[in-house]
């Protein structure tokens, strides 16, 4: 299948890639990321462990991998308005924690707001730019705090 764009040509900043590494065990990292998200204006709307699910259902033997579905309701409400509701297909803003090695956890995030813009979902471009700036500041604060650990 030929893609209409070359993914390698897109700067990671255009889709809001953020990542860091935490030197702690997996469960501690999940708790730390949850705490930092809450401290910076995000609630956790949903969370689950794909590794536990896959290991149980298809004997995948995956290392620990966890999804925290972060959400700031005010931002989500604005984004729904700015996209005529279509951004809901991307909700929530996921923060992923996976074990790279014992005692070493990768924390990873992509901006659904920036991805929505790349996909052409916004019907209110100026408002979406404001939402991207606002949520970007919040996510940067999360990763700055995690980087300080």
Please identify what each model-predicted range represents.
Residues 1-149:
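Acidic, polar-rich N-terminal leader regions of halophilic archaeal proteins
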């Amino acid at each position: 299948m030929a893609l209409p764009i070359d993914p390698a040509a897109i700067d990671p900043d255009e889709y809001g890639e953020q990542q860091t590494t935490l030197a702690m065990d997996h469960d501690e990292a999940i708790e730390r990321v949850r705490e930092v998200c809450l401290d910076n204006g995000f609630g956790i709307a949903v969370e689950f462990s794909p590794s536990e699910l896959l290991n149980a259902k298809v004997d995948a033997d995956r290392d620990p991998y966890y999804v925290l579905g972060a959400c700031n309701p005010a931002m989500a409400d604005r984004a729904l308005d700015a996209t005529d509701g279509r951004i809901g297909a991307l909700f929530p803003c996921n923060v992923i924690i996976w074990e790279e090695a014992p005692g070493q956890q990768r924390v990873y995030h992509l901006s659904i707001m920036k991805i929505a813009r790349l996909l052409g979902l916004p019907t209110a471009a100026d408002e979406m730019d404001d939402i991207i700036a606002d949520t970007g500041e919040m996510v940067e604060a999360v990763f700055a705090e995690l980087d300080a650990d």
